[in-house]
């Protein structure tokens, strides 16, 4: 397997004397990208993550993805899946996946007594007819990510936070999802998709 480190990484590792440490971390965590039992439990209790993507020219996007706990599902030791819910219609991150499927997922637990985080990198695919779609009310499609790297990340700079309230905008079964304020703005009402025309808060 090729090294996960590029020339830039190696340059800085040598500059700050961390090459040996980086090689050990590669051997211990990166060489075998398996989602273990602890990783699975961590992923499936989280209600948010950050998604990094880039287009065909390498221009990046980073987006926040939120849902109820368990909205990211571990399908097997190398695959996770999550829904794409209604957004602002720009499809910056999801559009990138159609041009460049390589993604990074940063999953952080801010609220536990000992905050922690997990990185999962992989290759993503989009399916509008995915068998999981029925499990996600109002989801437009399902994204599956085949992991190429799975590893815990140093938690020391994570600020501990409290969850005050889960978003009422997360689609849920037997619950009418409210309309966000911005869809009621005068600049937006005549360009909303047909499914949103006439809806009120």
Language-model segments: what does each one mean?
Residues 1-201:
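Binding-site signature for planar aromatic cofactors or substrates
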